[in-house]
């Protein structure tokens, strides 16, 4: 998947930014959220999040649902590195396992359970 955040900011800039965030907020995780291209789901209004490391993936999904004002009857799927993360994992655990070389965790969302990458 092409990440707009990576295209808009150099690797050096992203590394410096994530290091600053982690130093200032050690109990939080820097997350980039973008829609899977081609998905019919609503666009999100912001893509950078600072998430408490102790919330679960399921709780984070609820935050994203609320951000895009998705009705409860509509489905949403989160992907990290083209796979659906276990919903019981904490965001801190997911971050440690899947963070990018730049220090951010990249999460894609879609209304369909397909990657479309």
Curated annotation (Swiss-Prot):
The record marks 116-117 as: Cleavage. The precursor molecule is cleaved by ATG4 (ATG4A, ATG4B, ATG4C or ATG4D) to expose the glycine at the C-terminus and form the cytosolic form, GABARAPL2-I. The processed form is then activated by APG7L/ATG7, transferred to ATG3 and conjugated to phosphatidylethanolamine (PE) phospholipid to form the membrane-bound form, GABARAPL2-II. During non-canonical autophagy, the processed form is conjugated to phosphatidylserine (PS) phospholipid. ATG4 proteins also mediate the delipidation of PE-conjugated forms required for GABARAPL2 recycling when autophagosomes fuse with lysosomes. It is found in: Cytoplasmic vesicle, Autophagosome; Endoplasmic reticulum membrane; Golgi apparatus. A lipid is attached at residue 116 (Phosphatidylserine amidated glycine). Keywords: Acetylation, Autophagy, Cytoplasmic vesicle, Endoplasmic reticulum, Golgi apparatus, Lipoprotein, Membrane, Phosphoprotein, Protein transport, Transport. One of its GO terms (molecular function) is phosphatidylethanolamine binding. SUPFAM superfamilies: Ubiquitin-like. The modification N6-acetyllysine is found at residue 24. The keyword Cell membrane does not apply. The modification Phosphoserine is found at residues 39, 87-88. One of its GO terms (cellular component) is cytoplasmic vesicle. Monomer. Interacts with ATG3, ATG7, ATG13 and ULK1. Interacts with TP53INP1 and TP53INP2. Interacts with TBC1D25. Directly interacts with SQSTM1 and BNIP3. Interacts with TECPR2 and PCM1. Interacts with TBC1D5. Interacts with TRIM5. Interacts with MEFV and TRIM21. Interacts with WDFY3. Interacts with UBA5; promoting recruitment of UBA5 to the endoplasmic reticulum membrane. Interacts with GOSR1. Interacts with KBTBD6 and KBTBD7; the interaction is direct. Interacts with reticulophagy regulators RETREG1, RETREG2 and RETREG3. Interacts with IRGM. Interacts with DNM2. Interacts with NCOA4. Ubiquitin-like modifier involved in intra-Golgi traffic. Modulates intra-Golgi transport through coupling between NSF activity and SNAREs activation. It first stimulates the ATPase activity of NSF which in turn stimulates the association with GOSR1. Involved in autophagy. Plays a role in mitophagy which contributes to regulate mitochondrial quantity and quality by eliminating the mitochondria to a basal level to fulfill cellular energy requirements and preventing excess ROS production. This is Gamma-aminobutyric acid receptor-associated protein-like 2. It comes from Homo sapiens.
């Amino acid at each position: 998947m092409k990440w707009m955040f990576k295209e808009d900011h150099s690797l050096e800039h992203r590394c410096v930014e994530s290091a600053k965030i982690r130093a200032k907020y050690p109990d939080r995780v820097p997350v980039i959220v973008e829609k899977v291209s081609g998905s019919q789901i609503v666009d999100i209004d912001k893509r950078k999040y600072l998430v408490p490391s102790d919330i679960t993936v399921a709780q984070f999904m609820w935050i994203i649902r609320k951000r895009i004002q998705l009705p409860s009857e509509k489905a949403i799927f989160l992907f990290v590195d083209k796979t659906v993360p276990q919903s019981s994992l904490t965001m801190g655990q997911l971050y440690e396992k899947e963070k990018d070389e730049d220090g951010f965790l990249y999460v894609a969302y879609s209304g369909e359970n397909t990657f479309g990458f």
